[in-house]
Amino acid sequence: MTALDGIEGLSECIGRAIQEHLARSNLNLAWPQIDSLDRPILRFEAFIEDAGAVSTVASRSEKIASRTLDLTGMKTPQPSRSPTVTRNVATPHAEALHDRDDQESADDDDDDLQDDAAAQTASRKGTGGLRVANSQLIREDLSENQRQMQVDSRTFPKRRKVASEKFVFQPSTLDKLIIGIWEQAIFEQFQVAPNSVSSVVRHAPMDAAPVALSVTTEPSGGSFSQMNVFCRKVTQASRVCRSIEIIVQARWTELFEEQVQARTAAHPELSSTKHRKGVFMEACQDFGWSEKELRNKMAIWRGYKDVKDAAGWAALVFAGMGIYRFCKYRVGFDKEAMRRLKNLRNRLEVAADTLHPHWRQLLAIVGEPQALKYPGHPHEWVVYEDGSDPVPLRQTYIEHDPFFSFEHIEESVVDGSVWGCEDPRWMPQESAITRASGTYMCALCNEQQSDEPKLNACFCFPSLFGCVKRKPPPVQIYRTAEGKNNGLIALTAFERGTAVGELVGLITNGVRHLDVMEGSTPLAKYQIWQGREGNYTRFANHSCKANAQTSNFTWLDTQRVILVSKGIEAGSEITVDYGDKYWAGLDKSCLCGETCCRYKRDGRR
């Protein structure tokens, strides 16, 4: 191995350092020696010599480093030359340059020159008088923003909306409390037996025999059914006892304040703080608790009282476990929260009186009246968002129609004067096998349909069809503030793809100049008129940016029109797009207020 080969890294290091220095310095010097050469290069060689040698003829050691750098980029171009010049690497000048080299280093440098010449085989364009600095360019990574086409998620319809990658605000503690109250008031099987309040507060006799509960080890249909009934009763009783506990604790807080005021009025010479301390110590003695225990409990009970003062007794009776957390940690427990609860007071009482007629019997324990304020059907009352007193449904239409009447029905009624004994919504089964066997198959999921929950396998709209018991819808009819008369408001959220309700009414045909829903089957065309009878879907207003839509669904060979949610938030109005055919030729203007409104006509209502 030669010395040059052994220190090859030194040549590379020196060459790289010189090249970087020339690039950073941006040298712009006029070197006549460079301009006179066709392919100028910079050659450097390194030797080891004795610095103390006096003789002019000093013996050189063997060369330890050698490198050549191309200086063509520093050459000043001639204006008379062609814009593009093609250069051949193998030129006579280059060969002459090699001939002038020292004979000692000729063999070692031929390889370096050949490597540099191979890198300059490409054509070079001529430049102007200003030379471009030989600096490193910053290249953008194109892989970071490649404009690729993505598959649209709407190509594959989904029942539920996929989770968004963006940040979504979660409901506040107050929102969770309100939603929990609505869910308990609407969906919970809250039952209070009539005339049983006195038995709830009456102490059981000491000689009462305990009830023995035994469960057989062998599975039996009768014992299992009995256990189901017993467990349901215990769960309902526990739920009622929890409501009684909350209203009694709220009432005790009121009596505590009344006792302090009474003692202050009787003995004004003492401060109210001393009277409060005396009443507090008396309560600790009666409860058998320490001051710390009673003080912690009173802080929560005082929260119950504040909620009762704002939202009424119904908020306490139908509140779930969320009210305990809300009153204990008091997150968002401010004046704005109390204002929102106050606006919900009458609306909560409407739902409680119409869905749970016996709930006020619990208030007899705290001395409150038991008479219902809002009896009747849940959708027979029109509520207000600002907390005003609800009014009967007929009162909102009597100004325009003195003979207005509306009957709330669960199933559509076929107009016998038009269709006779036939139902125009009938959809025959496509398969001859299913027609012969008498079974009903769903056209969407291809599963068996039946009103018997044990036999039903179709769960396209489980809240409406094939369920054990259809629950009341979490909606109320409310008075809109935009001049649209009545509207439909959602008390809880409706997930995307879930059913809001079925459009029921009079199945007829030939109705003109009235709001109707048109439907058709392969055998007939029909109309659903909800002018005199129907359900809450009648009050869904139009919006050009609706959050619900109508959809056809066949159940037991009968076509139904379902109002399906597109994603409805709790507390928002439920709207549907009536369509172009409805607005064609109609002398009215759309009042939806959306920026994408399609039927806004100036000067019309």
Curated annotation (Swiss-Prot):
Bias (Polar residues): 75-89
Protein name: SET domain-containing protein SNOG_11806
PANTHER family in UniProt: HISTONE-LYSINE N-METHYLTRANSFERASE SET-6 (PTHR47250:SF3)
Organism listed in the record: Phaeosphaeria nodorum (strain SN15 / ATCC MYA-4574 / FGSC 10173) (Glume blotch fungus)
Domain SET: 473-579
Keyword Transferase among UniProt keywords: yes
Annotated SMART domains: SET
Alphabetized GO MF terms: histone H3 methyltransferase activity
Keyword annotations of the record: Methyltransferase, S-adenosyl-L-methionine, Transferase
Family statement drawn from the similarity comment of this UniProt entry: Belongs to the class V-like SAM-binding methyltransferase superfamily.
Pfam name, any one: SET
The keyword Methyltransferase belongs to this UniProt entry's keyword annotation: yes
GO biological processes: methylation
